Amino acid sequence: MQMYDSDIPKILKDYLNYNANLNKSKATITEYRYDLTNFLKYIKLLKLNDRKLTIDDISSIKDIDSKFLNGIDLNDIYAYMSYLKDCCDDKPATRARKVASIKSFFKYLHLKAKLIDDNPAKELESPKLGKRLPKYLTLEQSTELLHNVKSKELTGRQHDNTLRDYAIITLFLNCGMRLSELVSIDIGHIKFDENILTVVRKRRQRKNCLFK
């Protein structure tokens, strides 16, 4: 069982533990906790119906129970999504991630925990996302970057960490990995005799990268 903030409701703690049991990554569980804590704070503010209050005035959601959750409908959720867009300036990709968090939470409450009679997020739609072209460095830019990492002009800690930094940049360039994937590398992921690095991708998918 994981330890979570004392001011979040037991229902949310149970949901986070459920995801930990499914072997979801710590990063994913942290996102769920952040997204759902803010969502529940907003809904609590919405139900208070006091225009003098703001979401910052909601200091705790520990008292939220199944009765409260049964009172949430689809319009409440869309009100929260509008708040994220208009007041928080969240980009479509950020709002889409939060939609996924909310849908997963209510699906758990309805089908697994059986704490709510209906799933208000079942018909919740995600913002449309424009296609983003991948950004990449040219061969010349990559070469210059690696050259600068090994520059003799570096001093102090920069000089001491030259080999580490060179290895990090090389992995980024050659494997196209994310920062979260890089920091998750364990010594057991490296086969030195075969020059193979196993990268753990999203959804626990694995990719082998060759290195020299």
Model regions and ranges:
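Conserved catalytic core of the tyrosine transesterase superfamily
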Residues: 1-212
